[in-house]
Amino acid sequence: MTEDTIAALSTPPGEGGIAVIRVSGPDSQNKVKQIFRSSRTDGNFNNKKMYHGQIVSPETNRILDEVLVVFMNKPYTYTCEDVVEIHCHGGMVPVKEILQLLFSYGIRPAEPGEFTKRAFLNGRLDLTQAEGVMDLITSKTNNLKNVAINQLQGNLKQKIDRLRDDLVSVMANLEARIDFPDEDIDVEDYHELKHRIDNAKVDINNLIASYDKGKIIREGIKTVIVGRPNVGKSSLLNLLLGEERAIVTEIPGTTRDVLEEVINLKGIPLRIIDTAGIRESEDKVEQIGVKRTRDSMEQADIILVVIDSSQELSQEDKQILTMAQDKTSLLVLNKTDLHEKLDIDEIDKLVSQIPKVRISALKEEGLDKLEEHISELVFGGQVMQTEELVITKARHFHSLDKVKEALSSAEENIKAEMSEDLIAIDIKEAYDYLGEITGETASEELVDRIFNDFCIGK
């Protein structure tokens, strides 16, 4: 348990009906009682019951706000410490005054993520659950929310703990051999050890394989809209967004920079990037935009190539199609509300493997088909399910990869009939890397880095 008491605003700053100030630590309840004037006269407060009253400055007897206060006794609180929540009126002035009063009584401002960090240090949460808290708060799709809830409920922790228990059993077997070297070692025992390691590797590989899906859920799909100037790229972006965010004019080359927006497609965040039109230009600013477009195409997960179907295929169109042919791409034939002059056979000769969809961004026609095609490119047209265990964090992936390497090394040493000491070192290494994920063996630097990414008040 920590010895100091902290406080911070736990709800978003700004105007609102209610703001919640959280206070945690050994002096939280005593300090708040000194500034809280309750409607009750006896001064006794029951655990986890809400009380009406006023926050008053004892020195001036000035009322700062009318509030509701909840006193929560350790260890059954978020931080496992004594906690008080002050529900005051939303707005910067009352919140600021109440916090300043608390700080004047020796309570210090909470650091980013410190409430959740205390929950971790006091054993209420492991690191994966703590990360689940932040993902739940910042989730923009149902899929990420579901994954976050799974982590918060301890599903990943339980999986890692089971794997660590299995490795403890293997290490105990090896240590027994080391401690009693005179006993005969049956070859079958080595086979059994290898069998246990193989089973652990299957689980590790399944978790590693889930990262591709988890990364999509967390980071989204980088989708780049490309095409020559004035084919309707910005109109397409606005159609996907359902609102006008990009400039739409008849002037070619209007979009000279890269615009990025995020949409929710079947639970997957699609990071849509509208780029400058690709064409030869003497304009230095436009040239920079074109270069950024090429760079975006190189880094894209999906490329939407927009072609004006009311015009014949131009040399610039052909150049863009050639650039996109080796990428995961979708050909968007825009302006279908106009007479079609495009020769589809000519396109097929260039890039027959790129799927096509016809739309009219101006008339808002073809959006459903477009989304179906994008969905097909991303995950085979299926709605991504998140009930199964997936990892979404790069640090989890890298730790699991190290676990896999250590277990593979142990298998090689068993196969080569190396000493139990060497095999035990590999198993212990795998055990510790698993502990990094849950926080059991994580360094103080890693823990600080994780919680520094949190917001103040969380």
From Swiss-Prot:
One of its GO terms (molecular function) is metal ion binding. It is found in: Cytoplasm. It comes from the Bacteria. GTP binds at residues 230-235, 249-255, 274-277. It is an enzyme of class 3 (hydrolase). PROSITE patterns: G_TRME (PS51709). Its EC number is 3.6.-.-. K(+) binds at N230, T249, I251, T254. Keywords: Cytoplasm, GTP-binding, Hydrolase, Magnesium, Metal-binding, Nucleotide-binding, Potassium, tRNA processing. Its cofactor is K(+). GO terms for biological process: tRNA methylation; tRNA wobble uridine modification. Gene3D superfamilies: P-loop containing nucleotide triphosphate hydrolases, Probable tRNA modification gtpase trme, domain 1, tRNA modification GTPase MnmE domain 2. InterPro entries: G_TrmE, GTP-bd, GTP-bd_TrmE_N, GTPase_MnmE, MnmE_dom2, MnmE_helical, P-loop_NTPase, Small_GTP-bd. Residues 220-379 form the TrmE-type G domain. Mg(2+) binds at S234, T255. Binds 1 potassium ion per subunit. Coiled coil: none annotated. Belongs to the TRAFAC class TrmE-Era-EngA-EngB-Septin-like GTPase superfamily. TrmE GTPase family. Homodimer. Heterotetramer of two MnmE and two MnmG subunits. Exhibits a very high intrinsic GTPase hydrolysis rate. Involved in the addition of a carboxymethylaminomethyl (cmnm) group at the wobble position (U34) of certain tRNAs, forming tRNA-cmnm(5)s(2)U34. This is tRNA modification GTPase MnmE. The gene is mnmE.
